[in-house]
C-alpha cells in the first residue's frame, strides 16, 4: 500500500501551482516547486554565487507515522547551474507540521534566479527505523576497523 502524505496550502500560496508530483512512473522523488509570496512572484529570488536562501513551497505536510520525507537536490539544477541543498538530504520528521521550505545554495559562478513555480527540489517518502542505543564496553572487530575517509581507496 502506498503511504498518503496529506498536504495543505498556506493562505497566501498560489493555488494554480500543482501539488508535489512524480514526473515519470518510475520516479522516486516528487518535484517541489517554488511558491513565492505574492510580492515576490514577479521578480523571483536571485541567488548570488555561494549564497543561500530559504525558498518557500507554500505547503505544509502530514507524513504518516513510520515514514520521513527527504528533500534532495534536482540533478539538472546541480549540473547546469551549481544549485544544490547544503543539508542534503534534508529530513522532515513525521511529527513536523510547519511550513515546508527548501534551502538552496548556489555553488556556481553566476547569479541564479528562482522563478515562481520553478521545480527546485525533490522529496522522497521513506520508511523510518528507530534504533535502540546501548552503551557497550567494546565493539566487535572488523577487517576495516577504524579506517574511514578514503581508507578503502579511491580506485
From Swiss-Prot:
Domain of life: Bacteria
GO biological process, one term: dUTP catabolic process
UniProt catalytic activity: dUTP + H2O = dUMP + diphosphate + H(+)
Needed cofactors: Mg(2+)
A GO MF term: magnesium ion binding
Positions that bind substrate: 74-76, 87, 91-93
Associated pathway: Pyrimidine metabolism; dUMP biosynthesis; dUMP from dCTP (dUTP route): step 2/2
Top-rank EC class of the record's enzyme: hydrolase
Keyword annotations from UniProtKB, A to Z: Hydrolase, Magnesium, Metal-binding, Nucleotide metabolism
Listed PANTHER family: DEOXYURIDINE 5'-TRIPHOSPHATE NUCLEOTIDOHYDROLASE
Protein known as: Deoxyuridine 5'-triphosphate nucleotidohydrolase
Native source organism of the sequence: Cereibacter sphaeroides (strain ATCC 17023 / DSM 158 / JCM 6121 / CCUG 31486 / LMG 2827 / NBRC 12203 / NCIMB 8253 / ATH 2.4.1.)
Amino acid at each position: 500500500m502506498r503511504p498518503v502524505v496529506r498536504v495543505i496550502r498556506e493562505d497566501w500560496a498560489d493555488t494554480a501551482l500543482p501539488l508535489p508530483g512524480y514526473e515519470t512512473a518510475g520516479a522516486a522523488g516528487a518535484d517541489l516547486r517554488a511558491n513565492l509570496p505574492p510580492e515576490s512572484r514577479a521578480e523571483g529570488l536571485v541567488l548570488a554565487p555561494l549564497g543561500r536562501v530559504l525558498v518557500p513551497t507554500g505547503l505544509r505536510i502530514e507524513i504518516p507515522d513510520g515514514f520521513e520525507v527527504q528533500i534532495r537536490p534536482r540533478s539538472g539544477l546541480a549540473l547546469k547551474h551549481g544549485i544544490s541543498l547544503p543539508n542534503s538530504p534534508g529530513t522532515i520528521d513525521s511529527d513536523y507540521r510547519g511550513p515546508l521550505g527548501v534551502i538552496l545554495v548556489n555553488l556556481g559562478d553566476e547569479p541564479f534566479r528562482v522563478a515562481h513555480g520553478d521545480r527546485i527540489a525533490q522529496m522522497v517518502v521513506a520508511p523510518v527505523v528507530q534504533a535502540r542505543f546501548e552503551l557497550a564496553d567494546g565493539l566487535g572487530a572488523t577487517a576495516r576497523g577504524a579506517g574511514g575517509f578514503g581508507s578503502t581507496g579511491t580506485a
